[in-house]
């Protein structure tokens, strides 16, 4: 009975495979939105105000960061929790594949979230005259919470590594 339960639990990791595949569909949706934004801006490039162009560019940067985060979570999560990726040697391979454990993934995700939050905060500040002060305050508080969380996670990981 114990062996059956252990085998069933170990096999259940494959339930995550469709989740990681779903993230690739989310990446496709993000790519469609990215190019939709570019197609929307290009015809108006000579008429658009500089501030509006910068806001659009920040949105594109934000989408690129989210896309990178999706790729990182997809591949690392799959490799850490489901199965090792078997990519032939003749294909281009990401240098970090197979080298990112759950601790380093957590740190990279936290850093990505801080970067994404920074872009959002910059977009909000560029349009600060149209944003109520209390909302600005909450944006800053939330961003600082992300920064503090990433710092604490990194510090705790460093303490854990130093004890080994």
Curated annotation (Swiss-Prot):
It is a multi-pass membrane protein. The chain crosses the membrane at residues 15-35, 53-73, 136-156. Pfam families: UPF0114. One of its GO terms (cellular component) is plasma membrane. It is found in: Cell membrane. Keywords: Cell membrane, Membrane, Transmembrane, Transmembrane helix. PANTHER family: UPF0114 PROTEIN YQHA. Belongs to the UPF0114 family. This is UPF0114 protein Spro_2386. It comes from Serratia proteamaculans (strain 568).
């Amino acid at each position: 009975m114990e062996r059956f339960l252990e085998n069933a639990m170990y096999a259940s990791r494959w339930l995550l495979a469709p989740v990681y595949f779903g993230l690739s569909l989310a990446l496709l949706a993000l790519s469609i939105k990215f190019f939709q934004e570019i197609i929307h801006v290009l015809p108006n490039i000579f008429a658009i105000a500089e501030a509006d162009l910068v806001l659009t560019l920040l949105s594109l940067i934000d989408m690129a960061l989210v896309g990178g985060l999706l790729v990182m979570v997809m591949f690392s999560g799959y490799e850490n929790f489901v199965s090792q990726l078997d990519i032939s040697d003749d294909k281009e391979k990401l240098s970090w594949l197979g080298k990112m454990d759950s601790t380093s993934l957590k740190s990279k995700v936290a850093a990505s979230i801080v970067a994404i939050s920074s872009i959002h905060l910059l977009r909000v500040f560029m349009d600060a005259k149209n944003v109520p002060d209390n909302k600005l305050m909450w944006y800053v508080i939330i961003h600082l919470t992300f920064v503090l969380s990433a710092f604490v996670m990194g510090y705790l990981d460093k303490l854990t590594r130093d004890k080994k």
